[in-house]
Amino acid sequence: MKPIIAITAGDTNGVGYEVIIKSLLNGYVFEVMRPVIYGNAAVAKQHIHTLDEEYRNITWNLIDSPEQAKDGRLNLITCYTDNLPVELGKNTEHSNKAAKAALDRACADLKAGKVQALVTAPINKEALGEGHTEYLEKRFHGDELMMLCSGNLRVALVCNHVSIAEIPAQITEERILQKLTLLNNSLKRDFGLEKPRIAVLALNPHAGDKGLMGKEEQQIIIPAIEKAKEQGIWAFGPYASDGFFGSGHFTQFDAVLAMYHDQGLIPFKTLDMTGVNFTAGLNIVRTSPDHGTGYDIAGKNQADERSMRNALFLAIDVLRKREEYDELTANPLPFIVREDREGRPRREFIDFKTTKYNDDKSRD
């Protein structure tokens, strides 16, 4: 049975419906999931009329519950029934209420096990008073870790949506170690990496230059890295962000832990504007496109749907990887560890049916 994926429509006056519709008309999407859009049917129809002719004949399967979702159809649950005027490019009270109603309903269905993963289209933070990541952490089990993903490039954050003035107080040894632990666990369970290599970025220019430009590296970040190593986490650094990304050094790691939002997102988006925001650390799977509401291009048929499509596929990939990991760790097989060609440890499981062992008693 294909997993049911909840897709919240986001801000009704932004590009959410546009990127969702364009993404779902990629035929392969329906081969791996049953999508259910949480939004408003009337609003969806208005957005369709702003798109190319090929989208005009779309029909919706209007349902009341995810269990009614049909394979190969655009399933939609109407979550906000009040009069909902569409004012493209504007943040309004109606659009905020509609966005929150869709997210609340989708989260309720996710918690009830009616859907298997959540993909969220962009919202204006006024709708929630906070970001998606912080909202979800309060409603599901676990500690959140914001991670941006694009192929083998993964950038996680110590600090999410906080002002620059608040960052120094949040850069603590305990917090960095917690984020490193969450990141390491996610790379193993969600991405199938046996022994991930994690690069940790410095806070200050030139990694503090031995304390001349700040002491956070010596007093906080390096001790956190050392403690992570003691726990078996392959953490390295701290690295000055400019040289680390400018030299391409990031390609030698499975993930990067940045100290704050712009330190991580500026190089990430410079390298790829079609990445995905993944909320790691929680007991649910949630992804989203790595862009905002797009008020400036809403209704102009200019939105690039690739980030949304990548978010849909990443949700499926993580679901599969988690299932494989949980099955493997629930019934662990005996194994030996050998190094691969790059010197990384690799598990080789023992098959007792084909492998013969001689104990000391069998020897002459």
Where are these regions (language model features)?
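Contiguous, glycine/small-aliphatic-enriched amphipathic segments in soluble metabolic enzymes
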Residues: 1-135, 174, 178-259, 263-277, ...
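Flexible loop/hinge segments that line or gate small-molecule binding clefts
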Residues: 132-163, 286
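Intrinsically disordered or low-complexity boundary/linker segments at protein termini
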Residues: 163-168, 293-296
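Conserved anion/nucleotide-ligand pocket segment
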Residues: 165-166, 170-173, 177
